[in-house]
Amino acid sequence: MPVKLRILGADDHVELEQVRQFFRNYAAWLGVDLDYQNFGEEMASLPGAYAAPAGRLFFAVFEGRPACCVGIRPSSDGVCEMKRLYVEPDMRGNGIGRQLALAAIKAAKALGYRKVMMDTLPAMRIAVKLYRELGFKEAPAYYPTPVEGTLFLALDLENWSESEVKNENLFHLFDYNLAWARRMRQVDPGYFEKLSTLQA
C-alpha cells in the first residue's frame, strides 16, 4: 500500500493533533529536553512557522494509519530548516522517512529556497545515514545549542537533483542486504547452504 502524503493547514485539526503526538514521541525518542527550542510553543501553534506560503508541514499515512511527519520552515534569506522528521517505530523500515524527507526537500526547492539546514544527533545513525544519502553535508552551527555533539547539516538545493539521490540509494540497499545476510548467518550459520539446496 502506498504512502499517502498531505500538507497540513490550520483547519486540519485532527491531523494536527496527531502531529503534536508525533512531536511528543519524537522528543521522548531523542531523550533531549527541547525547551531551548521553544518546543512547547511550537507544538501549540501548529502549523505555525511550517504554514504556507513559506513553510510546509507534511503528514503521512501508511496502511491506513498515521505514520510520519516532517516540516520545513523559513530560517533566513533563501534558507529553510527541515525539522521533526519522525516515523512511528512499528512503521520504520518501509522507506516512509525517505519519502517524506524527499517530499520536504522538493517542496523547499519549489518554494525557491537555495539551501536546507537541519540538525540531528550522531547517535541517530540510521537517520544520519539517510540525510547523507539525500545529499546533506556537515555545516557550521546555525544556532546556539546546549546539546553537546549536535550535528549540523546543510543541503545545497541549487546543485541538488533527485536522480542523483536515487543512484546513491543503491548503496543504501547494498548495506541493508549485507546487514540482513550477516544477521541470518548469526541466527543460522547454515542458512545459505540450506537455501542453495532448496533452489537446486
Where are these regions (language model features)?
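Active-site acidic-Proline motif in GNAT/NAT acetyltransferases
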Residues: E88-N94, P122-A123
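C-terminal "cap" of GNAT-fold acetyltransferases
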Residues: K4, R114-L134, E138-E164
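Conserved G/P- and acidic residue-centered "switch" motifs that form tight phosphate/ATP-binding loops
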Residues: G64, G95, G112
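Short, conserved "active-site rim" segments that organize catalytic pockets and cofactor/ligand binding
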Residues: K166-A200
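Acetyl-CoA-dependent GNAT
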Residues: I7-K83, E88-D90, A101-A103, A107, ...
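Short alpha-helical functional segments enriched in proximate histidine and acidic residues
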Residues: A107, L111, W180
